[in-house]
Each structure stands twice: as C-alpha cells, then as structure tokens.
C-alpha cells in the first residue's frame, strides 16, 4: 500500500513502533504517538537536531474514563487502558507541553476503543472528548482519528449504520 499512497496521506498508528517512528517522521507521514515514551523519543530527536520539528503531522492517541460516560458499554470497563495517553492523570498535559517546547505542533487526536454495544453513544463521547481537549489545550487540529468497535458490513436491525455513526460523530465535533 505504501507504494501507492504518499506518506503524508498515511496515518501511522499503534503501540511498539519505536523502530519505525523516526522513519515515518522523516518521510512526512502522519504519526500518532501512542504513549509518553514515544512523545519523549520524538522530542529528544528533534531537540538534538536529527530532524526538523515541522517535518510531519503529529497526533496523540488519548485514553480517558469512557466507562464513566458510557457505563457497561466498554470492553475495558473501569480498567485503565494500556493504549494511549491518559487524560485524567496528567500524562496528556505533559504530552502536549513537551512537543510544544520542542517546536512540534500537535495536529491530531486519535481515539480508539472497543465496545460491547457498538452504540453511537460511545462514539458521541469520543467525539465530545476530542472537542473538550481541543478547547482545553487550545489545539488547532487538522484531524480527529476515531476507530474501533463500529458495527458494519451488514444491515442488522437495532445496530447503527455507518451513516448513523457519521452523523453522531460529526454532530459532536461541530459543537
């Protein structure tokens, strides 16, 4: 796929990508940082002058207490997610401040979850959190990357369609 799509149109996601992190950054790809270690690694590399700070779009994968907003709908329940940068414990604030100090702008937010119900309420909560973070930290975002747990591929009575997910998410993002 990489041969057919320019790097700046590929969002590079996921944990454990340290080895590829700088390659993607140097090629101008969209890079979602998954944890505080990846944030620090990229900031240190930029501070050392290995790559320019404006070289690519950087996003942050964020986790938060979704269960509090959507009780009994998440697969993680009340457990802290092992993926993403935690909003509640201050890690997110540090993950936004550190790149700023290194001259790296945060261009995006990545929110990904797994659900038991696949309801639109979960995705409304994710989109609402994206808006809250954008406003709270004064971010100028180019993208919000949301995934996980969509019901799709077939029409099933009582399950949301892709159009319903899109309407729900866009409605929250426009607020």
Provide a role label for each language-model segment:
Residues 1-143:
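Active-site-proximal beta-alpha core segment in soluble small-molecule metabolic enzymes
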Residues 112-115, 144-154, 175:
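Glycine-rich beta-strand-to-loop/alpha-helix junction loops that act as flexible
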Residues 168-170, 174-175:
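Charged (often Lys/Glu-rich) extended helix/loop segments that serve as interaction or gating elements
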């Amino acid at each position: 796929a990489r041969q057919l799509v320019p790097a700046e149109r590929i969002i590079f996601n996921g944990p454990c990508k340290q080895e590829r992190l700088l390659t993607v950054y140097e090629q101008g790809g969209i890079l979602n940082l998954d944890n505080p270690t990846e944030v620090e690694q990229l900031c240190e590399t930029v501070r050392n002058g290995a790559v320019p700070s404006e070289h690519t779009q950087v996003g942050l994968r964020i986790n938060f207490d979704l269960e509090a907003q959507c009780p009994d709908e998440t697969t993680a329940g009340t457990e802290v997610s092992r993926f993403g940068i935690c909003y509640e414990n201050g890690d997110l604030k540090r993950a936004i401040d550190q790149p700023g100090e290194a001259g790296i702008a945060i261009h995006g937010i990545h929110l990904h979850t797994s659900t038991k119900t696949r309801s639109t309420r979960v995705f409304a909560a994710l989109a609402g959190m994206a808006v809250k973070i954008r406003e709270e930290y004064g971010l100028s975002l180019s993208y919000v990357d949301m995934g996980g747990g969509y019901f799709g591929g077939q029409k099933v009575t009582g399950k949301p369609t892709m159009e319903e997910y899109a309407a729900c998410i866009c409605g929250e993002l426009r607020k």
